[in-house]
A protein has these predicted regions:
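Short, hydrophobic alpha-helical packing/hinge segments within bilobed ligand-binding/sensory domains
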Residues: 69-70, 91, 154, 217-220, ...
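Extracellular/periplasmic bilobal clamshell ligand-binding domains
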Residues: 307-346
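Short, low-complexity disordered leader/linker segments with a strong preference
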Residues: 1-33, 345-346
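Extracytoplasmic ligand-binding site segments that recognize negatively charged/polar headgroups
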Residues: 80-81, 85-208, 213-222
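Mature extracytoplasmic/periplasmic domains
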Residues: 256, 260, 265-323
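A ligand-binding cleft/hinge motif common to bilobed small-molecule-binding domains
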Residues: 91-93, 228-245
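Early extracytoplasmic/lumenal segment of secretory-pathway proteins
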Residues: 28-93
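Periplasmic-binding protein-like
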Residues: 196-204, 242-266
Length: 346
């Protein structure tokens, strides 16, 4: 998720916690736990407090991309690391390759705190192997001073009053996906006929598109170039920080989101400590510290009242879907309709 959204807040200078950058570290000592994830994923005090409470020292090792993580974990045959945090799609691959062990639910009793919206996902349908850490949710944000309609869902983006006024991110599967949600279809549709209908629907949106841009898309909203934007999580956070009067829309058709999940590798040197750490992270106060620090959406319902309200999905939102891999034929069709859509926007 960090690689997709470039939303990392760099980790502070390390105080009392070992750091290894992009390398495999093996914790031989049962009083050590090797944590493997992106840089900047935890406030230092959370790691320090875990050591104070348990006597277990956290050895923090980081990777730059999900693919790097999977390669390192494969080379280690599921060993070397105790807790890994990565994106949903790569966790799916790790589970299928036998590199992940089941969570000890007796130890991880705080799993009950996880918002049901984020449970039972495609990569772990029975919630046996992973625990959500945070979610990335691209959302519609608009300036109510510049927009004459009350935007409630994706379908409203097609309103004629929004001609040449919408800025969107450039992730083709996400944009195709929200178009499908507006049509009452799945974001992961593989039927070519339905994908073609999605393409036609997208072309109808083209007159309303002001720009397609992945980086700093929120700036178009903030400087008045666009009055509506569809933004990544970090961009939503930045937009609201700079202009609290902007409105955020949780689309009535349902959310499209991605999840960062915690898991214990199949041959983790210190699996007991790993499960203790995951349970500790799920304590409401600890979880709130982490979410407020990284700026992703809260997946721990017990922490909702402790988290910045802009990072909490309303209780009224009960539907969501994650973009998944599709067949090669479907993928080619998605690329085709995206190319045609961009041409129509020019």
């Amino acid at each position: 998720m960090k690689s997709k959204k470039a939303a990392a807040i760099m980790l502070c200078a390390v105080l009392g916690t070992s750091m290894a950058t992009g390398v495999s570290v093996s914790a031989k000592d049962k009083d050590e736990l090797v944590l493997y994830t992106w840089d900047g994923m935890f406030p230092q005090e959370v790691l320090d407090d875990f050591e104070k409470e348990t006597g277990i020292k956290v050895v923090y090792s980081n990777f730059d991309t999900d693919e790097t993580m999977l390669e390192k974990l494969s080379q280690a045959k599921g060993g070397d690391y105790d807790v890994v945090i990565a994106d949903d799609y790569i966790i799916d691959s790790a589970v299928k390759e036998g590199l992940v062990q089941k969570i000890d639910k007796d130890t991880v009793s705080n799993f009950k705190n996880i918002n049901p919206l984020y449970q039972g996902q495609f990569y772990d349908p029975d919630d046996e192997y992973t625990v959500p850490y945070g979610a990335g949710i691209p959302l519609i944000v608009y300036d109510p001073e510049q927009v004459d309609i009350d935007i409630k869902g994706y379908k409203d983006l097609w309103d004629k009053s929004l001609e040449d006024s919408i800025a969107i991110v450039g992730n083709y599967r996400v944009i195709c996906g929200i178009t499908q949600l507006s049509m009452g279809e799945s974001m992961n549709e593989e039927d070519v006929a339905v994908i073609d209908k999605t393409g036609e629907k997208l072309k109808e949106l083209a007159p309303n598109i002001r720009m397609i841009q992945d980086d700093n898309t929120q700036n178009a909203l903030l400087n008045g170039e666009a009055s509506v934007a569809f933004l990544y999580t970090s961009q939503v956070t930045q937009a609201l920080k700079d202009n609290p009067d902007l409105k955020v829309v949780y689309p009535e058709e349902g959310l499209g989101f991605g999840i960062m999940g915690m898991f214990v590798p199949s041959e983790a040197p210190n699996a007991k400590a790993a499960n203790e750490f995951i349970n500790y992270i799920l304590e409401p106060e600890v979880s709130a510290q982490c979410i407020n620090y990284i700026g992703y959406y809260n997946t721990n319902k017990a922490a909702d009242d402790l988290v910045d309200e802009s990072l909490v999905v309303p209780d009224s939102v009960t539907k969501g879907e994650i973009v998944q891999n599709v067949s090669q034929e479907a993928e080619q069709e998605y690329n085709k309709i995206w190319t045609e859509f961009k041409a129509a926007c020019d």
